[in-house]
Amino acid sequence: MTAQIIDGKAIAQSIRKQLSAKVTARKEAGKRVPGLAVILVGADPASQVYVGSKRRACEEVGFLSQSFDLPTETSEADLLALIDKCNEDPSIDGILVQLPLPDHIEESKVIERIRPDKDVDGFHPYNVGRLAQRIPVLRSCTPMGIMTLIKSTGVDTYGLDAVVVGASNIVGRPMTLELLLAGCTTTTCHRFTRDLEDKVRRADLLIVAVGKPNFIPGEWIKPGAIVIDVGINRLESGQLVGDVQYDVAAEHASHITPVPGGVGPMTIASLLENTLYAAENYHD
């Protein structure tokens, strides 16, 4: 068996085209274009790349993108004041603060300062709570994008044994909630998990988000499983690899995401979808 590749790049491009058409229709109807504020604190190279991609994606679909690049030494109070300003700006539908933040700034305080109706990253406790209660509105972008990828396979998720490896607030925990909502019997694995191999081998649907190159051996993959690899790791050779040993896993799986070109583009597409949703449902 050779797995079908789930082409996140192509699916994300299709979503962007649809969003662009909706923005054009809004303008023709005399409505304003959706606005996204992107806040970057410091000069972390990876964060700069991610932020650049998000800003370009905004422009591509016709959103208004407002950029705030702040120095590393920016105080927590100054960052919170900027968020307050964006909260009150009627031209801004979504506020994105690029994580991680410098050590002197408390992430949870920043996330909770963003108004829930402008929390297009889906990190605010209100929005995570709505997902937990099975009434999601603004959903965490990476898990939301992953659900779109899974849907693209045409496989019915109800009753599947799903395993999530990684329990971060950004991916693992909201991913578990998304899979429960999709009717899966879901196991979340983390650093205290015993016998990880046994759990992975049982997975009809495997999602790995740990940030360790080739962490899951390919031979652990159950024949016919769907494999979603969230990791993106650069080896010393410069090669980008995921958290799953791709070549061997692709021999066992029915569907698999590549790295790069799998989950990454979908995270940005979901961010754009959330921003349009916020504009249409909260701010029009």
Curated annotation (Swiss-Prot):
It comes from the Bacteria. GO terms for molecular function: methenyltetrahydrofolate cyclohydrolase activity; methylenetetrahydrofolate dehydrogenase (NADP+) activity. It catalyses: (6R)-5,10-methylene-5,6,7,8-tetrahydrofolate + NADP(+) = (6R)-5,10-methenyltetrahydrofolate + NADPH; (6R)-5,10-methenyltetrahydrofolate + H2O = (6R)-10-formyltetrahydrofolate + H(+). NADP(+) binds at residues 166-168, 232. CDD domains: NAD_bind_m-THF_DH_Cyclohyd. Pathway: One-carbon metabolism; tetrahydrofolate interconversion. Gene3D superfamilies: Leucine Dehydrogenase, chain A, domain 1, NAD(P)-binding Rossmann-like Domain. GO terms for cellular component: cytosol. Pfam families: THF_DHG_CYH, THF_DHG_CYH_C. GO terms for biological process: L-histidine biosynthetic process; methionine biosynthetic process; purine nucleotide biosynthetic process; tetrahydrofolate interconversion. Its EC number is 1.5.1.5, 3.5.4.9. Belongs to the tetrahydrofolate dehydrogenase/cyclohydrolase family. Catalyzes the oxidation of 5,10-methylenetetrahydrofolate to 5,10-methenyltetrahydrofolate and then the hydrolysis of 5,10-methenyltetrahydrofolate to 10-formyltetrahydrofolate. Homodimer. This is Bifunctional protein FolD. It comes from Shewanella loihica (strain ATCC BAA-1088 / PV-4). The lineage of its organism: Bacteria, Pseudomonadati, Pseudomonadota, Gammaproteobacteria, Alteromonadales.
